[in-house]
Regions:
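The feature primarily captures lumenal catalytic ectodomains
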Residues: 1-243
Length: 243
């Protein structure tokens, strides 16, 4: 019997991450990179672990504080924070920020998720698919000061979010988004990085020509809304891409 090729990959042992959520006492400064200041508990919990990452976060923090104004947010509104230094990236948003947003929404359903910039505006659709409608953005070019913010932990390491939590996020999205698989998965999809910010495929035209022989479709997910992406993946039998 031929062993499935995926069996050659070793399973990695890691502690699955589930974000803790809580209300911070007093007034806290929140930067556009998601660092929480003035808190012995929440400042380290808002940054990934690892020396080189923390050095980079410190550089970004100092630059941000030196160049951006500080705006006090309304005291009569409860704000939740779910972003970090890397969550403008789609992978980190889906696997880190969405679980954090769900944790806040379940514990504090009246909290408004506060996102740091217009770069995140296209992510609002993913929050609505979780049933989160109250979404706001940092004032343009600013860091913010918030009284008693609702905070969620940043993962210590990348790619460690609890699989059970990710499945919960997925199931809620499918339910709230009213997604139904009307057809069995029958597509072979190749996700191109042609419109990505980096990690381009040097021989992509040749690769796409070869995949076309197997009736694979080449797509740029940047051209699809979130709901369109979910619908496409429901039709996908074989997915091909890189990270």
């Amino acid at each position: 019997m031929t062993q499935h090729p995926l069996h050659i990959f070793e399973k990695l042992a890691y502690p699955p991450f589930s974000p803790k959520v809580g209300i911070a006492r007093g007034s806290k400064i929140i930067t556009r990179s998601g660092v929480v200041l003035l808190s012995r508990k929440w400042t380290p919990a808002s940054i990934y672990s690892g020396l080189h990452i923390r050095i980079l976060a410190l550089f970004v923090l100092i630059t941000s504080l030196a160049t951006r104004r500080l705006v006090a947010m309304p005291k009569d509104q409860q704000f939740g924070i779910v972003h970090s230094t890397w969550t403008a990236g789609y992978y980190h948003w889906l696997t880190e920020s969405l679980p954090r947003a769900l944790a806040i929404h379940e514990a504090y359903p009246k909290a408004t998720i506060l996102l740091p910039s217009e770069k995140y505006r296209h992510y609002a659709e993913t929050l609505r698919c979780l049933g989160i409608e109250s979404i706001a953005f940092f004032p343009e070019g600013s860091n913010v000061r918030i009284d008693a913010p609702v905070l969620s932990e940043c993962p210590r390491k990348f790619a460690t979010t609890s699989p059970a939590l990710l499945k919960k996020v997925r199931n809620i999205i499918l339910e709230k988004g009213a997604f139904t698989a009307s057809q069995p998965p029958d597509k072979i999809i190749y996700i191109s990085r042609r419109k990505a910010r980096g990690r381009f495929i040097l021989n992509e035209e040749a690769l796409e020509a070869m995949l076309a022989e197997f009736e694979a479709e080449s797509v740029c997910l940047e051209d699809f809304s979130f709901k369109e992406q979910v619908a496409l993946m429901q039709r996908t039998r074989l997915l091909i891409s890189i990270h």
